[in-house]
C-alpha cells in the first residue's frame, strides 16, 4: 500500500493518507514508550528483588506511566532567567524530531515501511546524529554548569562511539551488497547475520548502548554527578521531550538490531507459518529485554574509561572485522 502511494501522483488525498499513517506510527511509538518504561521498571524491580509499580491501574501498575505523563503535563514549565530562551525552547524539539524521523526507514515487515530508500542504513545513522545537537544546545542554553558538562559529555560520547557503530555494520553492507534495509533482511533468509558477523554484532550492541546514553554509558545525565545532566533545568513537558527522544531511540535501535543481525521478520527454520510481524515482535522484545538487563547489571564507568574503550578497543576490533569480512567474502563467496 505504502509503495503504491509513493509511486502515485502527488495529491492532497495522498498527503492526508501519509499524515494519518504518520500519526498512527507516532501513537504506536508513544504506546511503546509508555509501556516500555513500565516494562523496564517491572523487570528492574524483579531483578532487584522488588515489586515495581503496583498501585495505579491494578496490581501490575498498568496505568502508572500514564499517570506520570499526566503529572508532567500539569507541572510548571519554567525557564531560568539566565537561560538563552529561544535555544532553550528549541533544544527539546531538535532532540526529538530526528528520533521520530529515523523510524521512517525501518522495515517492520515486508509490507510495512514508510520509506524504502536505497540508503536506508546511511539515512538512519546520519539523521540520528542530529539529536546530539539538541542535547548540546539544551546544555549550553540552560546557562548551568551541570547542564553544560552533560551536553559536552554527550558530544564527546557520540563522537567516540558513532565511528565504531558505523564501522561495525560495514561487514553487513559487504555481505548484503546494499545499504537498503529490506535487501539486508532478504539476504538473511537462510542465515542471520548474528551468526555470520558475531564480532560486528558485539561491537554494534556496545556502541548502540553508548549512543542511547544508557547504563553503563549514561555519563551525560549521571544523576550522582551532574544532578540530571543536560536536562537539569528542564521541567514539565520540555523535560518529557528529552525522555521521549531517548525511548524512541531505544525503540528505533532495538528495531535496527533486529533488522541488521536477527533477520528482521524472517522466521526460524520450519516455522514459516507464523506471520513475519510476530517474528519481528519476538526478536525486538528480546533485544529490549537484553538492553534493560544491561542497565540493571553494569555499573557506570568513568569518563576516561569510556573514551579509551571506544577509541582503543571498539574501533580497532571494528576495523579488524571489516578486513576479516572482506577477506572471507573475496576467498569464499
Swiss-Prot record:
Q: Which EC class heads this enzyme's classification?
A: translocase
- InterPro entries from the UniProt entry: NADH_UbQ_OxRdtase_su1/FPO (IPR001694), NADH_UbQ_OxRdtase_su1_CS (IPR018086)
Gene Ontology CC: plasma membrane
* Annotated membrane topology: Multi-pass membrane protein
**Matching Pfam families, A to Z?**
NADHdh
Report the EC code(s) recorded for this entry: 7.1.1.-
What residue intervals traverse the membrane? 15-35, 88-108, 117-137, 159-179, 191-211, 239-259, 274-296, 313-333
Which GO BP terms, alphabetically?
aerobic respiration
Going by the UniProt record, its keywords in alphabetical order are: Cell membrane, Membrane, NAD, Quinone, Translocase, Transmembrane, Transmembrane helix, Ubiquinone
Provide the GO MF annotations for this entry: NADH dehydrogenase activity; oxidoreductase activity, acting on NAD(P)H, quinone or similar compound as acceptor; quinone binding
Query: Which PROSITE patterns does this UniProt record tie to the protein?
Result: COMPLEX1_ND1_2
Q: What is its main location?
A: membrane
Q: Where in the cell is it found?
A: Cell membrane
Which reaction(s) are listed as its catalytic activity? Answer: a quinone + NADH + 5 H(+)(in) = a quinol + NAD(+) + 4 H(+)(out)
Q: How does it assemble?
A: NDH-1 is composed of 14 different subunits. Subunits NuoA, H, J, K, L, M, N constitute the membrane sector of the complex.
Q: Which HAMAP family match?
A: NDH1_NuoH (MF_01350)
The job of this chain, per UniProt, is described as: NDH-1 shuttles electrons from NADH, via FMN and iron-sulfur (Fe-S) centers, to quinones in the respiratory chain. The immediate electron acceptor for the enzyme in this species is believed to be ubiquinone. Couples the redox reaction to proton translocation (for every two electrons transferred, four hydrogen ions are translocated across the cytoplasmic membrane), and thus conserves the redox energy in a proton gradient. This subunit may bind ubiquinone.
Its family? Answer: Belongs to the complex I subunit 1 family.
The protein's name: NADH-quinone oxidoreductase subunit H
Amino acid at each position: 500500500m505504502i509503495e503504491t502511494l509513493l509511486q502515485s501522483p502527488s495529491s492532497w488525498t495522498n498527503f492526508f493518507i501519509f499524515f494519518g499513517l504518520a500519526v498512527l506510527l507516532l501513537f504506536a511509538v508513544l504506546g511503546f514508550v509508555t509501556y516500555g518504561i513500565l516494562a523496564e521498571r517491572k523487570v528492574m524491580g524483579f531483578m532487584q528483588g522488588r515489586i515495581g509499580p503496583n498501585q495505579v491501574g491494578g496490581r501490575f501498575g498498568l496505568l502508572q506511566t500514564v499517570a506520570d505523563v499526566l503529572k508532567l503535563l500539569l507541572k510548571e514549565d519554567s525557564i531560568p532567567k539566565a537561560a538563552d530562551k529561544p535555544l532553550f525552547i528549541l533544544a527539546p524539539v531538535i532532540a526529538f524530531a530526528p528520533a521520530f524521523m529515523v523510524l521512517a526507514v525501518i522495515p517492520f515487515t515486508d509490507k510495512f515501511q514508510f520509506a524504502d530508500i536505497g540508503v536506508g542504513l546511511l539515512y538512519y545513522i546520519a539523521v540520528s546524529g542530529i539529536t546530539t545537537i539538541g542535547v548540546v544546545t539544551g546544555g549550553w542554553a540552560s546557562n548551568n554548569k551541570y547542564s553544560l558538562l552533560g551536553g559536552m559529555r554527550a558530544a564527546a560520547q557520540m563522537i567516540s562511539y558513532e565511528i565504531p557503530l558505523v564501522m561495525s555494520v560495514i561487514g553487513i553492507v559487504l555481505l548484503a551488497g546494499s545499504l537498503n534495509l529490506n535487501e539486508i533482511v532478504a539476504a538473511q533468509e537462510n542465515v542471520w547475520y548474528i551468526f555470520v558477523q558475531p564480532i560486528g554484532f558485539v561491537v554494534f550492541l556496545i556502541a548502540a548502548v553508548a549512543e542511547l546514553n544508557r547504563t553503563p554509558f549514561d555519563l551525560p545525565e549521571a544523576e550522582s554527578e551532574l544532578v540530571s545532566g543536560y536536562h537539569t533545568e528542564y521541567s514539565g513537558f520540555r523535560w518529557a521531550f528529552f525522555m521521549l527522544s531517548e525511548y524512541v531511540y531505544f525503540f528505533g535501535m532495538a528495531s535496527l538490531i533486529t533488522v541488521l543481525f536477527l533477520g528482521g521478520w524472517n522466521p526460524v527454520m520450519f516455522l514459516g507459518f507464523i506471520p513475519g510481524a510476530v517474528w519481528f515482535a519476538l526478536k525486538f522484545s528480546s533485544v529490549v529485554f537484553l538492553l534493560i538487563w544491561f542497565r540493571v547489571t553494569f555499573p557506570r564507568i568513568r569518563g576516561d574509561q569510556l573514551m579509551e574503550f571506544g577509541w582503543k578497543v571498539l574501533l580497532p576490533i571494528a576495523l579488524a572485522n571489516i578486513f576479516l569480512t572482506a577477506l572471507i567474502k573475496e576467498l569464499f563467496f
